[in-house]
Amino acid sequence: LYIQIAENIKLAPLVESDAADILKAVNVSRASLGKFLPWVEGVNNIESAKKYILERVNSGLNGSQWFKIYYKDNLSGVFAIKSICPDLNIAELGYWLSCDAQGNGIISQVITKASQLLTSTHVKFIEFRCLEKNAASIKVALKSGALLVDVIPNFLVADNVLQSLNIYRTPVK
């Protein structure tokens, strides 16, 4: 089961057997991903990559859907509807890309099509949560039309800096 996003971009459900490919993608990009994603440090062998996958696909969070991103037929990252808050009709998105796939507008194209994944829900808003120094993720959120709606100060230390968590939100298109 694939969801075609563009000629060279497709999504498929993230599954435990993706562990080796996930580990490879993380290893290629460990330095850059690790600056903003605390889980990166703990994904360092096949078992921990399986654990990373299973914790996400079995999160039990409402509306959670996790996908691997293929770019030119290589597993190049992960995209998720991390959860849906039914009371507020908000879907939180999450994503990461390996270094070799960055700069191709992949995530922006995936987000443009993400509304198709939400058609059977009552979601009215998409939410992005980005650490304040994560310029690439903030750029993606802003490019989608999202606006800064909240800041959680002193959220966590990343890249040796105590950072706030910025929350961006945009209506589903």
Tell me the role of every PLM-derived stretch.
Residues 34-54:
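Conserved GNAT-fold acetyl-CoA-binding loop/helix
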Residues 1-21, 25-32, 68-173:
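Acyl-donor (CoA/ACP) binding surface of acyl/acetyltransferases
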Residues 40, 54-67:
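A short helix-loop-beta-strand connector motif used in the catalytic cores of GNAT acetyltransferases and
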